[in-house]
Every structure is written in C-alpha cells, then in structure tokens.
Amino acid sequence: MGLSFAKLFSRLFAKKEMRILMVGLDAAGKTTILYKLKLGEIVTTIPTIGFNVETVEYKNISFTVWDVGGQDKIRPLWRHYFQNTQGLIFVVDSNDRDRVVEARDELHRMLNEDELRDAVLLVFANKQDLPNAMNAAEITDKLGLHSLRQRHWYIQSTCATSGEGLYEGLDWLSNNIAGKA
C-alpha cells in the first residue's frame, strides 16, 4: 500500500521532462518566444543559423526546447531534430499573409515525416498585436489544420513580445504530452 502511494505521489509530483521542437518560417518569432519563456524578457535577436536550445521550467515540467532556424536554405535540416520529439511548436507570423501558404506547405511536409507521427502539434499564431494580423481561425483555415485528422493539434494566439498566450500553449502541450505518456 505504502509503495503504491509513493509511486502515485512521485508520478504526480516528480518533474516531467519533455522534448519540444520549435520551427516555423524565418522571422516568425521563434527565438523571441524561446527567450521570453526562458528569461521572461524580450531579447534582441538575429536570424538563427542553426539552432538554440534551452530548458524552460514551467509547472514542474522541464521542457527542452529546440529552436531551429527557419530560412528556406536551412529548413531541410529540420528533420535532423525530429527524433524523440514529443511536441512540435510551429510558429506562424500572423501578419505575414504573403507566406502563409509557404508555412502551410512546410508544416504539412514535416508532419508527413515518420519520426513525428506521435508528436502533438501546437501552433503559435504569433504577432497578434499587429493591426492586420490574421486571427487563430483564419490561420487554422490557411494552414489546413482541420485536415489533420490523425494528429492531436491546437492553435494558440500569441504575442511573443508581451508573452500573451505563451503559457496557455505550454499548458496545452504539457497536458497533451502527459496524456500520451
């Protein structure tokens, strides 16, 4: 009896670790999101050539977040980060109407990869503070998210600079990855 209670207690309260891959087109706000979550502040960023990796502690969960550069020349490298990924954060610049089709194509190409078949998908519809930003429903439509019948996904409106929506997204991720474990 005592042993099973101890197991239950440790399962409920032990720190959980989750491997998260964050990708999206260049200038979507991935690095700003990563450091807003990690440091709680806005940092000056330059285009990511390669990757940034940080551990973000939130609600007894340790998220290892891999932020991979989004320039078209380095997108083929994304697949090298797929292994053991439990959650995929796809960041979209909600104000970039000219490249939303490109974002959709990259997302669907990635989701067809076998190594990501079990990963849950969180879409951050970023830059919601900009006046012409597409809302989450429009982004859902433009990315073709409703066609992802076999995928557990969620879209969260965010503003990386203020932090708005970021923790709601992490809550969804943690609940849905933990539910699959």
UniProtKB/Swiss-Prot annotation:
Classification via PANTHER family: ADP RIBOSYLATION FACTOR-RELATED (PTHR11711)
Family note: Belongs to the small GTPase superfamily. Arf family.
Stretches assigned to coiled coil: none
Main localization, broad class: Golgi
Keywords: ER-Golgi transport, Golgi apparatus, GTP-binding, Lipoprotein, Myristate, Nucleotide-binding, Protein transport, Transport
Location in or out of the cell: Golgi apparatus
Gene3D superfamilies named in the record: P-loop containing nucleotide triphosphate hydrolases
Database matches in PROSITE patterns: ARF
GO biological process, alphabetically ordered: protein transport; vesicle-mediated transport
Protein name, UniProt field: ADP-ribosylation factor 2-B
Gene source species: Arabidopsis thaliana
SMART domains for this protein: ARF, RAB, SAR
GO molecular function: GTP binding; GTPase activity; mRNA binding; phospholipase activator activity
NCBIfam families: small_GTP (TIGR00231)
Lipid addition sites, N-myristoyl glycine: G2
Cellular component terms per the entry's GO annotation: Golgi apparatus; mitochondrion; plant-type vacuole; plasma membrane
Cited InterPro entries: Arf1-5-like, P-loop_NTPase, Small_GTP-bd, Small_GTPase_ARF, Small_GTPase_ARF/SAR
Function description: GTP-binding protein involved in protein trafficking; may modulate vesicle budding and uncoating within the Golgi apparatus.
Regulation of this protein's activity per its record: Activated by AGD10.
Pfam families: Arf (PF00025)
